[in-house]
Design a protein with these regions (language model features):
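Transmembrane-helix signature of polytopic, membrane-embedded enzymes
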Residues: 22-30, 134-155, 330
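Perimembrane helix-loop-helix junctions
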Residues: 208-246
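Transmembrane-helix motifs of polytopic, lipid-linked glycan transferases
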Residues: 2-12, 117-141, 173-174, 316-322
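Aromatic/glycine/proline-enriched transmembrane-helix motif characteristic
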Residues: 140, 268-346, 417, 421-425
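Aromatic-enriched
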Residues: 366-425
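Start-transfer (signal-anchor) and selected internal transmembrane alpha helices
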Residues: 1-38, 328, 333-334, 414-425
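Intramembrane catalytic core of multi-pass membrane enzymes that act on lipidic substrates
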Residues: 21-124
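Specific aromatic-rich, kink-prone transmembrane helix
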Residues: 129-133, 172-187, 340
């Protein structure tokens, strides 16, 4: 995190003050390689999820169904590495996730180390796709590719959790980023197939699809087109998006030999409680006050109610963001990031690596300086709040307040003297 701040001060600050074409991009690329390289030799950091991935793949390999059975039904070396919390839970991930796991475990047998190495390679491939796509998206939208790469890819949350933690977000976000880039180049079929493939990895990828529909509308019915043409293009684009994404998922489901059981598990688990999720944060604030008047009140009961309310708010928020971000391609990319933010704020469970879907896009759509600063602060705060063993400090108020102060001073130092209008809105 400290190195990221220093890179912001020495490379990004001068570029924001006096923009040069492609200025600072090569420096950030070299720094990114230097930061990622040591992590390629490291074991899982900040999470043990990769062992669950291996376990789920071994279950499919051995004839079990991870959508209806927990890991405990298939004892072996992988199970010993799975957290106790997840040994009796089903998986919410899609058929591509299980297919990859089956292929990996079929290749390595029950060798845990070899399996982890292969997942490290897969996470690196996803990360490379992100690092390749994001500057190109920024360039296409007239934003600064160096700023986009520093803010969205080199930040500590992305590197720690996608490379260090080896989360399947790496492949999912890599596919979505590549799909959005394809859409900006009017390769809409490729874009939808890429997003559909990402959905087969993790369902949240589908959030990007409605914004690709706006891009299709702008291309096939540009400004000045008749209302009837716009309506026809909109309807046909929507139908094409739904059909192609379903086709991609169906093909992967069929080829992998898995099932559609993930649709019933897509809401995920509710065991994780941390204030990154809005319903949990609201419960943490409300519960002490409720206890004053209702000493027997249950934290979990209040949380369950707020999670239900938050789900309704999420649906309303997603529709609102989609509708408001319809003007042009820049709006569509900005809306994709905003929609992911809405989803994760109101989701029942939010973990730090979920923010990869948001952070990666934040520098691509010519964000105003205040938004760059805010994103920098959030990335710093989240990046240092989770330790290498996966525990967090979000209920340590001295830590929280201290890190907010540190993040604020870091932001002032990084962006000292940068004019507000230098990064156009």
């Amino acid at each position: 995190a400290a190195a990221w701040v220093l890179a912001g001060r020495t490379i990004i600050r001068p570029q924001l003050k006096n923009p040069l074409p492609e200025g600072g991009l090569r420096d950030i690329q070299r720094i990114l390689i230097a930061w990622v390289a040591p992590l390629l030799l490291a074991g899982p950091l900040a999470s043990r999820d990769v062992y669950s991935y291996l376990m789920q793949g071994a279950m499919v390999r051995d004839g079990f169904d991870p959508y209806t059975e927990g890991a405990a039904v298939n004892p072996g070396p992988f199970l010993l590495e799975v957290s106790q919390d997840w040994r009796n839970t089903t998986t919410p991930y899609g058929p591509l996730h299980l297919w990859i796991g089956e292929l990996v475990t079929s290749l390595v047998g029950d060798n845990v180390t070899a399996g982890v190495v292969i997942y490290k390679v897969l996470s690196l491939l996803g990360f490379i796709a992100i690092a390749w796509s994001i500057p190109r998206i920024a360039r296409k939208l007239g934003a600064d590719p160096a700023v986009a790469l520093w803010l969205g890819v080199a930040n500590p949350v992305i590197i720690l959790h996608l490379i260090g933690g080896m989360h399947n977000e790496s492949l999912m976000v890599g596919l979505v980023s590549s799909g959005l880039l394809a859409a900006l180049h009017q390769r809409f079929h490729a874009a939808l197939i890429l997003v559909g493939t990402a959905v087969a990895m993790k369902a949240t990828a589908v959030i990007a699809a409605p914004f690709i529909v706006w891009m299709m509308l702008h291309h096939y019915a540009p400004k000045g087109s008749s209302k009837w043409r716009q309506l026809a293009v909109f309807v046909l684009s929507g139908i094409a998006a739904v059909a192609e994404i379903i086709a991609a998922v169906a093909l992967i489901t069929w080829v992998s030999g898995t099932s559609w059981g993930w649709l019933s598990q897509v809401s995920g688990n509710s065991k994780v409680i941390n204030p990154l999720a809005g319903p949990t944060l609201a419960t943490d604030i409300i519960f002490p006050a409720v206890q004053i008047f209702m000493p027997d009140a249950s934290y979990n009961a209040i949380l369950a109610v707020l999670r239900s309310i938050a789900m309704a708010c999420m649906l309303i928020g997603l529709v609102a963001v989609w509708w408001l971000c319809r003007k042009d391609n820049r709006d569509a990319i900005m809306g994709t990031a905003a929609a992911y933010q809405v989803a994760f704020v109101f989701n029942a469970v939010t973990l730090p690596w979920y923010y990869a879907s948001i952070f990666t896009l934040m520098g691509t759509f010519r964000p105003p300086l205040w938004l760059i600063k805010f994103t920098t602060g959030v990335a710093l705060f989240i990046g240092v709040s989770f330790s290498g063993d996966g525990n967090h400090q979000l209920y340590n108020w001295f830590w929280v307040i201290g890190m907010i102060v540190v993040a604020w001073f870091a932001i002032q130092w990084i962006f000292e003297g940068v004019p507000k209008k230098r990064q156009p809105e």
